[in-house]
């Protein structure tokens, strides 16, 4: 499981979206990015559909995910 607390592009507040991790200063859950990518959407489409999220945030989340998965792999 990824510890999102160190990713600067996201935040979590109990009063926002039930405490889910969201893109900073939005109510867009981080999981929405991965669900849309899994369904075949492009990053540009995601950004169009969720205008509160910017490209830098998406890139930061993807980089953080890759780094976290690399850390998990080296710990195994």
Feature roles, as predicted:
Residues 1-28, 34, 70-76:
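Acidic, low-complexity/disordered tracts enriched in E/D and polar residues
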